[in-house]
Amino acid sequence: MKVPLHNFIPSVLDLADTALRPLDSTHDLCSAFPVMQQLRPHLTSEADFVSRIERMRLEGYRLIGAFDADVLVALAGYRFQENLVYGAFLYVDDLVTAEAQRGDQWGSRLLQALERLARASGCERLVLYTGLANARAQRFYFREGLLTGALRFQKQFDTP
């Protein structure tokens, strides 16, 4: 699969929702850390977060932020992938709205933008995972038209 250039993405977002924009700079990532930490509380260091994102970018990971009056209130991390199960798809690694802004449609707006991006990039679907115990997120995804399609298994390894 030919992964679209990131330069293409801002124009797709700008046409659709002016409150959304890519989070590309180190400053952007630092401002994203407190919001991301609400989804990923195990992330305790801003410097480690920025370093991880920079490594993940080498694998195609990108972040989009949603802004209310220049304040970052929600974000989505995604990447384009292709496999034998789904074909070409957009995978959503992270989707979170700051606690104080939940219910204000920021998550919906981000998902809509990601769907437009996936379609414009020739993807066959949008895929994401959520924890089995995360009933609130599951209700949100069902309301947004996403359906369950798989059960993921994992095995935790002891670290040396």
Regions found by a protein language model. Give the residues of each.
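A conserved beta-turn-beta hairpin within the catalytic core of GNAT-like acetyltransferases
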Residues: 82-92, 102, 148-149
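Conserved beta-strand segments that form the floor/walls of ligand-binding pockets within enzyme
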Residues: 77, 91, 96, 127, ...
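Conserved active-site alpha-helix within GNAT-family acetyltransferase domains
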Residues: 108, 120, 132-151, 155
